[in-house]
Curated annotation (Swiss-Prot):
Gene source species: Escherichia coli (strain K12)
MF annotations from Gene Ontology: 4 iron, 4 sulfur cluster binding; metal ion binding
Gene name of this polypeptide: ynfG
Gene3D superfamilies, sorted: 3.30.70.20
Lineage: Bacteria, Pseudomonadati, Pseudomonadota, Gammaproteobacteria, Enterobacterales
Binding site for [4Fe-4S] cluster 2: C24, C126, C129, C141
Name of the protein described by the UniProt record: Probable anaerobic dimethyl sulfoxide reductase chain YnfG
Region (Disordered) residue spans: 183-205
Signal peptide: none
Known function: Electron transfer subunit of the terminal reductase during anaerobic growth on various sulfoxide and N-oxide compounds.
Length: 205
């Protein structure tokens, strides 16, 4: 493998505006049922009474997540046709001419990255905009973020710059697939496995 690329996600900056998601959909010409990049909204808290005085501990934060181009991708392991594969540059992609649309990859991926495109009759997913990267450009989601909450580059450089945190609630633990992401947590971020909050927009992710 030449260089493993990855994403840095700054949850302290992300406002959940979905510009990255819409830019991706426009660039990839995706229908309403498919979104390669999705915004997770995690929220929780309640009101508590203390001697007649009410206090709140309500919180919410956002995570912009696409395919994490994992070191140990679950999707490639279950693909019966070999359509889902990891390139030399680390991008996990699907060969749409080989894919049979069985959806095993979608069921295996803990992030739901591979998505079935009913119009095309096969699986589709984020490819890291590898054609843009080859031209020295940034992925369209990174380029479009108005808050500069996304960053892209060789994952080791991102880890040296931003640390190694790769999971907060509601994401799964990182050891399952070894995702190539780095997360800067929001001040309200909860650890993976947290039960004090909930995914506030499940139909969108």
């Amino acid at each position: 493998m030449t260089t493993q690329y990855g994403f840095f996600i700054d949850s302290s900056r992300c406002t959940g505006c979905k510009t990255c998601e819409l830019a991706c959909k426009d660039f990839k010409d995706l229908g309403p049922e498919v979104s390669f990049r999705r915004i997770y909204e995690y929220a929780g808290g309640d009101w508590q009474e203390d001697n007649g005085v009410w206090h709140q501990n309500v919180f919410a934060y956002y995570l912009s997540i696409s395919c994490n181009h994992c070191d140990d991708p679950a999707c490639t392991k279950v693909c019966p046709s070999g359509a889902m594969h990891k390139r030399e540059d680390g991008f996990v992609v699907v060969d749409e001419d080989v894919c049979i649309g069985c959806r095993y990859c979608h069921m295996a991926c803990p992030y739901g990255a591979p998505q079935y495109n009913a119009e095309k009759g096969h699986m589709t997913k984020c490819d890291g905009c590898y054609s843009r990267v080859a031209e020295g450009k940034q992925p369209i989601c990174v380029e479009s973020c108005p808050l500069r909450a996304l960053e892209f580059g060789p994952i080791e450089e991102l880890r040296q710059k931003h640390g190694t945190l790769a999971a907060v609630a509601p994401l799964p633990r990182a050891h399952f697939t070894k995702p190539n992401i780095v997360i800067k947590p929001n001040a309200n971020s909860r650890p993976t496995g947290d039960t004090t909050g909930y995914l506030a927009n499940p139909e969108e992710v």
